[in-house]
C-alpha cells in the first residue's frame, strides 16, 4: 500500500474561520475556498512533494492523478483535510491516518497536539508561520511571490507530517490505527440524513412549551427573581438547587448567579422545563434544546450528518465529542 501525505490551505478571515465555526460549518460554507494543496506520494518509487493552486476544477484534476484507492493517506488533524477531500472533491481514500490522533494516544497532553509542538518534540524541523499572512486573502489576491512562500509553507507541513507519522507509527498497533481510520471516516464520509420536517416540528413543540411556561412565570416575576421561590420551583421539577458558600457572610447560599457553573450546567438539563426556567433566570433567549435542534436543522440543509468524535480524548483512551 502506498503512503500519501497531504495538507490543504484554505481561505479564512476574522469572521470566517475554524475558531468561529465548526469544521462542518466552515467547509460547507459558501465562502469556503482551497488556496492550495500539497501532496506527497511514496510507493515503490520516491516522489517529491507536489504543490498545486488553482480553481476547484483544476485542483480536482491535480488530485485525481494520485492513487487514493490503494493508499494510506496521512494528515495532521485529518478530519479537516479528509472532509475537504471527500465533500469538496469526492475522493475517499482506502485508509486514513491522523498524526494528531496518534499523538494523543502516545503523549496525551504532555507535548501538545499542534504540528509545531510535536515537530519540535521529535526534532523533525521547524513549522513555518506563513499562514498568518494569508488572513483575508482569496487565491486570486496572492502575488506570485506570496503564493510561492505559501507553497513552501504547505510543503514543509507535509514533510513534517510524514516524518511525524513515521516517528509515531511504531508506537501504535494495527487495531488502534484501524480505530483512528474509522473515527475520521465517521466524520469525513457521513451517511446519516436528518429529517428536516421532524426536526422543525420538534423545534416548534419545544418553543411552544417554553412560551407556555414563560407565560405562567410572567404572571409572577417575583418567583423567578426570588432565590427561595426559585429554589422551590426547581424542586418541583426534581432538581436540587445548587448552593455555594457566600464570600460575604461565610454561610451557605443559593448558587444562582451567571458565574456559578453548577447553575449554568442546568441549561443542559434533560428536562426542557428546567432548561427554560434557568434560561429565564439567566436572561438567555434560547434553551440548549432549541439551539441544538436549530444546529441539526442547519446541518441537514447542508448535507448529511458528520459524527465528530475525538479519538483518545482522555487518558483512559475513551472517545470524546468534538466540534458542537
Set out the residue ranges of the language-model regions.
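A short acidic-Thr-Gly-centered motif at the start of a beta-strand
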Residues: 1-2, 64-67
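Active-site-proximal helix-loop-helix substrate-binding element of RNase H-like nuclease domains
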Residues: 32-61, 68-169, 176, 180
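Short, conserved, GDST-rich strand-edge loop motifs in beta-rich repeat architectures
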Residues: 20-25
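Cytochrome P450 core scaffold surrounding the K-helix E-X-X-R motif
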Residues: 13-17, 51-53
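Conserved "right-hand" nucleotidyltransferase catalytic core of DNA-directed polymerases
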Residues: 1-9, 14, 29-31, 36-38, ...
Amino acid at each position: 500500500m502506498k503512503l500519501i501525505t497531504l495538507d490543504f490551505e484554505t481561505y479564512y478571515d476574522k469572521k470566517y474561520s475554524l475558531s468561529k465555526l465548526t469544521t462542518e460549518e466552515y467547509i460547507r460554507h459558501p465562502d469556503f475556498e482551497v488556496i492550495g494543496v500539497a501532496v506527497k506520494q511514496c510507493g515503490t518509487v520516491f516522489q517529491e512533494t507536489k504543490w498545486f493552486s488553482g480553481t476547484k476544477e483544476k485542483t480536482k484534476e491535480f488530485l485525481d492523478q494520485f492513487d487514493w484507492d490503494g493508499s494510506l493517506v496521512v494528515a495532521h488533524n485529518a478530519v479537516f483535510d479528509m472532509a475537504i477531500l471527500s465533500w469538496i472533491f469526492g475522493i475517499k481514500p482506502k485508509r486514513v491516518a491522523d498524526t494528531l490522533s496518534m499523538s494523543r494516544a502516545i503523549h496525551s497532553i504532555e507535548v501538545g497536539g499542534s504540528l509545531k509542538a510535536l515537530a519540535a518534540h521529535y526534532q523533525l524541523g521547524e513549522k513555518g508561520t506563513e499562514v498568518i499572512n494569508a488572513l483575508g486573502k482569496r487565491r486570486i489576491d496572492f502575488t506570485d511571490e506570496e503564493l510561492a512562500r505559501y507553497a513552501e509553507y504547505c510543503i514543509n507541513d507535509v514533510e513534517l507530517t510524514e516524518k511525524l507519522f513515521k516517528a509515531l507509527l511504531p508506537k501504535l498497533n494495527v487495531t488502534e490505527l484501524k480505530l483512528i481510520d474509522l473515527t475520521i471516516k465517521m466524520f469525513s464520509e457521513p451517511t446519516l440524513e436528518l429529517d428536516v420536517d421532524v426536526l422543525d416540528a420538534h423545534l416548534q413543540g419545544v418553543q411552544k412549551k417554553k412560551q407556555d411556561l414563560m407565560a405562567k412565570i410572567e404572571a409572577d416575576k417575583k418567583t423567578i427573581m426570588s432565590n427561595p421561590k426559585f429554589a422551590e420551583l426547581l424542586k418541583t421539577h426534581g432538581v436540587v438547587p445548587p448552593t455555594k458558600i457566600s464570600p460575604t457572610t461565610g454561610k451557605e447560599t443559593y448558587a444562582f448567579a451567571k458565574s456559578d457553573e453548577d447553575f449554568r450546567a442546568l441549561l443542559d438539563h434533560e428536562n426542557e422545563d428546567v432548561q427554560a426556567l434557568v434560561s429565564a433566570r439567566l436572561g438567555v433567549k434560547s434553551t440548549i434544546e432549541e439551539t441544538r435542534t436549530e444546529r441539526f436543522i442547519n446541518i441537514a440543509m447542508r448535507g448529511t450528518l458528520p459524527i465528530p468524535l475525538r479519538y483518545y480524548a482522555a487518558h483512559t483512551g475513551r472517545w470524546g465529542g468534538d466540534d458542537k
